[in-house]
Design a protein with these regions (language model features):
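Beta-propeller folds
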Residues: 1-181
Length: 181
């Protein structure tokens, strides 16, 4: 009978989703807390200034509301601190091999042949108006050594979600205007 055992003492980072995926060759690709991650960012003892939000769309569109959004630069720093991960290959003998650079990795899936990774990362600017699934996103195919083989998509921040005629939400990228016809 086989038994379960710990492969690595390193801490997994599951802040943005499932931290591990099988490679198919008796190894895992996992998101780890970066080994050089420092202490949690500390808030300034007094506010730096007011937080002002302004709507400049020029129209009275309906807007979705969301709970638990980032509210300040300190929230941004906390989010980046805890969401930043280092991808690594973990063999069944416990060897951990880093893959690429650390970043805000929201997903990493191993290809069926175990040779490639589909990696989704988030980047700044963050928003105080929409949740993280609307933050700037890059989807890339990585080789197992972390080399970017191909960028499949780069999506900018989507701060405005318009409502279509059928009541469906339609994402509008920052700087883009909703076509009126």
């Amino acid at each position: 009978a086989k038994s379960a055992r710990q492969l690595s003492a390193r801490r997994l980072n599951a802040v943005l989703g499932a931290p591990c995926d099988w490679t198919g060759d008796e190894a895992l690709v996992c998101t780890f807390v970066p080994q050089d991650r420092g202490a949690e960012p500390v808030a300034a003892p007094t506010p730096v200034g007011p937080i002002v939000q302004q709507t400049l769309t020029g129209s009275a569109d309906r807007a979705a509301t969301y709970q638990d959004l980032l509210k300040s630069p300190h929230d941004e720093a906390i989010f980046a601190h805890y969401a930043t991960s280092q991808l690594a290959r973990v063999s069944l003998d416990g060897a951990v091999t880093p893959i690429g650079a650390a970043g805000i990795i929201s997903g990493a899936t191993v290809s069926p042949d175990g040779q490639w990774l589909l990696v989704t990362t988030l980047s700044r600017p963050f928003s105080y108006s929409v949740p993280l699934n609307f933050f700037p996103t890059r989807i890339e195919v990585w080789a197992m050594d972390g080399r970017v083989a191909r960028t499949l998509a780069t999506r900018p921040l989507i701060e405005r979600v318009a409502w279509g005629g059928d009541g469906a939400q339609v994402p509008v990228a920052r700087g883009a205007e909703l076509g009126r016809g």
